[in-house]
A protein has these predicted regions:
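Short nucleic-acid-contacting surface segments enriched for D/E, G, S/T with interspersed K/R
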Residues: 65, 121-141
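OB-fold ssDNA-binding interfaces and closely related basic DNA-contact patches used
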Residues: 2-105, 147-158
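A short, charged
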Residues: 137-151
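Acidic, glycine-rich flexible loop segments
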Residues: 101-130
C-alpha cells in the first residue's frame, strides 16, 4: 500500500495520492484507516473539527438535495476493513464495512453517505480528473435512479 504524501510547504495532503489510497483500500478491504483529504482546507484545529463533524454526519442527506444544482469543493473518504465473524455462518454472516463519502458543498453544507452509487460516481469523477477544489468546484446535481436492485443515488455533472 502506498503512503499519503504531504506537501511540506503547505502542510496539506496531496489530494490525488490520498484519493488513490482510499479507493485502493475500499476495493481491497485493507486495514481500517480514515484519511482526511485536504485540498483547500487549512490544516488548523478549526478546519479539522469541521471535517470531523462533517464525517460524523453531514448536514443533509443525498435525498434532501435531489435535482438541486450544487458545487462540490471537497471530498473525504473513510474506508473500513472487511471482517469475517467466526462461527456458524447462518447466525454470524460475513460483515463488510462500506466506505463513507463526505461531500463539502460551496454553500457550507456537507453530505455524508454510504451509497454505492455515489461511491462509484466519485471513482468515476477522479478517473476523469475531476478533482473538486474551492477554486475549481465540481458542479453537479444529486440524482435518484431506479436499477434492477431498487433505488440508488448518483451524480450528474453539469
Amino acid at each position: 500500500m502506498s503512503e499519503v504524501k504531504i506537501n511540506e510547504t503547505e502542510n496539506n495532503f496531496t489530494l490525488a495520492t490520498a484519493i488513490s489510497n482510499a479507493v485502493e483500500r475500499a476495493e481491497t478491504g485493507d486495514n481500517f484507516m480514515t484519511e482526511i483529504v485536504y485540498n483547500s482546507f487549512e490544516n488548523t484545529d478549526k478546519a479539522q473539527s469541521a471535517v470531523y463533524n462533517a464525517m460524523m454526519g453531514g448536514t443533509c442527506k443525498p435525498g434532501d438535495i435531489i435535482g438541486e444544482e450544487v458545487e462540490i469543493i471537497g471530498i473525504t473518504i473513510t474506508t473500513g476493513q472487511c471482517n469475517t465473524i467466526f462461527g456458524d455462518t447462518s447466525e454470524n454472516p460475513e460483515k463488510i464495512i462500506k466506505p463513507c463519502v463526505t461531500f463539502f458543498l460551496s454553500d457550507g453544507r456537507t453530505v455524508s453517505t454510504l451509497s454505492n452509487g455515489l461511491v462509484r460516481a466519485v471513482k468515476l469523477m477522479f478517473a476523469c480528473d475531476n478533482i473538486p477544489t474551492e477554486d475549481a468546484p465540481f458542479k453537479c446535481t444529486f440524482e435518484q435512479r431506479t436499477g434492477k436492485n431498487g433505488v440508488f443515488h448518483t451524480l450528474k455533472a453539469l
